Amino acid sequence: MSLLSDLINLNLSDTTEKIIAEYIWIGGSGLDLRSKARTLPGPVSDPSKLPKWNYDGSSTGQAPGEDSEVIIYPQAIFKDPFRRGNNILVMCDAYTPAGEPIPTNKRHNAAKIFSHPDVVAEEPWYGIEQEYTLLQKDVNWPLGWPVGGFPGPQGPYYCGAGADKAFGRDIVDAHYKACLYAGINISGINGEVMPGQWEFQVGPAVGISAGDELWVARYILERITEIAGVVLSFDPKPIKGDWNGAGAHTNYSTKTMRNDGGYEVIKSAIEKLGKRHKEHIAAYGEGNERRLTGRHETADINTFLWGVANRGASIRVGRDTEKAGKGYFEDRRPASNMDPYVVTSMIADTTILWKP
């Protein structure tokens, strides 16, 4: 095993200019991540300098067998924490051979919204709190739970420490460092209310980069759980009953919200979000109705409510923002399995471009 480990950790730059690029794209479910690697002649830092590639879309549920080729366009580059050296991870989006975005390519439309002059001028910042659950392989039951049974009730686990409270910290910490190495603006981690559930935060990130960074952070987490022999779940309510669900709270601000007088702009933006509540809920993740029940720090899915420091609201404004008269707000509705390209661009569209 030590030889295998040595080979995995070989530093290619000692002997060759060539690098390995791992191309990542979103599969047919809209949540599954796929990837494959290719050799390039030397280091690359600009995605536009990378070659397009293709894959068999009939094997990912994205194209018919008789016309199976899907083309992937490189969009963002990150350092590869697994191969290290000059090797890279490449976030791509997917198109037909004719150049049309395929249905699961939500990045294409998001990029249009983020490149609109009115949106560019507002410089939208995002901070996404990605919750997830670690499951025991083969039994699909949370890490640290007795198989077929339950741990003690919620209370001691949130931000807890100790072998009876925190399960999977090695995975969480490995992911944290790997994201920092990759160049992702990961801003923190914490244990969540339900045992076996954790959270990491990405941001502040501007515009389309929030989606790119969150997707690659998810990919890195998938790879680390693969190594650890643990299953990663983004199910918004993995366990029925008196257990917290998993969300992807999205913190948001624009330039005018961050400037003096921004609190009035925030209130106006929240009012617009309330008017499009149903459209946002429809786009905020599968199975969210199991999570947004009005219990376990959520608002009811059919009700739009905002408040200061209220974790039972759809939109929460922090005490610091209220006091300063400017800042940001948190959209607490997105589920853990949401597509960040959809959520971030929709918030920008509703608050900046949409005229009620």
From Swiss-Prot:
Family: Belongs to the glutamine synthetase family.
Localisation per UniProt entry: Cytoplasm
Listed GO MF terms: ATP binding; glutamine synthetase activity
Catalyzed reactions per annotation: L-glutamate + NH4(+) + ATP = L-glutamine + ADP + phosphate + H(+)
Subunit structure: Homooctamer.
Primary location recorded for the protein, binned into one broad class: cytoplasm
Name under which the protein is recorded: Glutamine synthetase nodule isozyme
Matches recorded under Gene3D superfamilies: Glutamine synthetase, N-terminal domain, Glutamine synthetase/guanido kinase, catalytic domain
GO terms of biological process kind: glutamine biosynthetic process
SUPFAM superfamilies to which the protein is assigned, alphabetical: Glutamine synthetase, N-terminal domain, Glutamine synthetase/guanido kinase
Enzyme class of the recorded protein, top EC level: ligase
EC number of this enzyme: 6.3.1.2
Organism: Vigna aconitifolia (Moth bean)
Organism classification: Eukaryota, Viridiplantae, Streptophyta, Embryophyta, Tracheophyta
Keywords from the UniProt entry: ATP-binding, Cytoplasm, Ligase, Nitrogen fixation, Nucleotide-binding
Domain GS catalytic: from-to ranges: 106-356
Spans annotated as Disordered: 41-66
SMART domains (alphabetical): Gln-synt_C
Any matching Pfam family: Gln-synt_C
Cellular compartments per GO CC: cytoplasm
Keyword Cytoplasm in annotation: yes
